[in-house]
């Protein structure tokens, strides 16, 4: 058994890990199963989110929603990180959304801008809930790594609001799903 681990399993894990590091998802992402919306414009940058829902969901009824924020150390990453999770949750009746936000490698920003963008995304979702078939009182947020930080921060920290937004619309999610 030890020989198998040394000769097959461990080298396989190494190769797969190395391949994962080298594989860079394209940016901006292409997600043909989703509808794409611009939720915020900052200078020349349009921040987008991708909404996944089944055809049945677009025809009436209010459904719970979740918005995912990608990981990447506040430096990089792609909203496509949560594409599969969005597809799965949409197939189960939720409206699932993955959002872009500003990161340092593309926008020369700090982590505080990520939190501002996360709050803007939740606010946009609530503001557009009726046209998306979403129950505006059942909006969850989730993310992995830096994206988990964004989700946790928008749920717990006051401030970091973008100018010109309607602060009467809550930017706090009703539930959280945080990874690592």
Language model features by range: what are they?
Residues 37, 81-84, 103, 109-118, ...:
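Mature catalytic domains of secreted/periplasmic carbohydrate-active enzymes
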Residues 61-71:
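Short beta-strand element of the alpha/beta-hydrolase
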Residues 65, 93-100:
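A fold-wide structural signal in alpha/beta-hydrolase
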Residues 1-10:
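Bacterial N-terminal signal peptides that target proteins for export
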Residues 24-60:
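N-terminal cap/lid segment of alpha/beta-hydrolase-fold proteins
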Residues 78-79, 85, 99-136:
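Catalytic nucleophile-loop/oxyanion-hole region of alpha/beta-hydrolase
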Residues 120-180:
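Primarily recognizes the serine-hydrolase "nucleophile elbow" in alpha/beta-hydrolase
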Residues 9-19:
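Bacterial N-terminal signal peptides
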């Amino acid at each position: 058994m030890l020989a198998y681990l040394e000769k097959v399993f461990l080298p396989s894990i190494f190769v797969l890990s190395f391949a994962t590091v080298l594989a860079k998802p394209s940016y901006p992402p292409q997600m043909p199963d989703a509808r794409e919306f611009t939720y915020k414009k900052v200078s020349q940058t349009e921040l987008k989110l991708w909404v996944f829902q089944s055809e049945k969901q677009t025809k009436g009824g209010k459904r719970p929603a979740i918005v995912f924020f990608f990981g990447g150390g506040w430096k990089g990453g792609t909203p496509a990180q949560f594409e599969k999770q969005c597809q799965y949750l949409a197939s189960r009746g939720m409206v699932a959304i993955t959002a872009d936000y500003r990161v340092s490698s593309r926008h020369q920003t700090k982590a505080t801008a990520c939190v501002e963008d996360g709050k803007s995304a939740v606010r946009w979702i609530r503001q557009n809930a009726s046209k998306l078939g979403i129950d505006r009182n059942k909006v969850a947020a989730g993310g992995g790594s830096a994206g988990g930080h964004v989700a946790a921060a928008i749920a717990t920290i006051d401030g970091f609001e973008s100018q010109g937004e309607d602060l009467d619309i809550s930017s706090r999610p009703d539930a959280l799903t945080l990874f690592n």
